[in-house]
Amino acid sequence: MMKLTIRKKVLFCSLIPLLLLGGIILLIASTIVKGAIIDQVENSLKGTAIATQAAYDQNAGTYLQTENGDIWKGSYNISQSENLVDTIKQESGMEVTFFYGSQRIMTSAVDKNGDRILGSPAGDKVVEKVLNGGEGYFSDNVSMDGIIYYGYYVPVYQKGDNTTPIGMVFAGAEKQEISHSVIQIINTIVAIVLVVLVICI
């Protein structure tokens, strides 16, 4: 009976450091994994936004707004570029949007009725960073029709004038889908840590 009690005490004393070590490993691994995934998301969104901007920018001429409100790049009507944004979405899995100034002119994103989400303005922070500051901007809290996205914005300039942006291009991915992927990876890490702990015990 005495030997059994001592054995339990030894087991208990050895179990505490193992559990602490497992918890620390889990915390560090989860933080690293989440950070790495978010960095990858940002880089992917940035790449898609830049590629979309280049697709519009390859058309000769300047960006301008006609009397009926349509936005053109030379002889190319951006306000009717549904095929372009839908193709980019199909190939990349990301939503893309062209802003003229702060207004959403063309987008692949649709609302619950299947209508494109057009005319809504960008947020103040986006305007400050991209239109006023001329910077690329990554956000983890972009809302479109009640859905939260990770998003990246790049400024759009007239050809030969990099002083004042005339608009922006946005690329976004649903935050919930990415969070689900992160949770799946973390759950896998938890399972591995638990298996290792059981083996050690």
Kindly give the residue locations of the regions a language model identified.
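A short beta-strand signature within small-molecule sensing/ligand-binding domains used
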Residues: 135-139, 146-157
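Extracytoplasmic/periplasmic sensor domains and loops in membrane signaling proteins
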Residues: 79-93, 108-144
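Non-catalytic regulatory/interaction regions at protein termini and inter-domain linkers
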Residues: 1-4
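Short N-terminal helix-loop-first-beta-strand/juxtamembrane motif that initiates sensory/input modules
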Residues: 43, 47-59, 84-106, 136
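Extreme N-terminal signal-anchor transmembrane helix of membrane signaling/transducer proteins, especially
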Residues: 6-32, 190-201
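Juxtamembrane membrane-water interface segments immediately C-terminal to a transmembrane helix
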Residues: 30-54, 184-188
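Membrane-interface helix-start motif
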Residues: 173-193
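Short, hydrophobic beta-strand elements of compact beta-sandwich sensory domains
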Residues: 48, 150-179
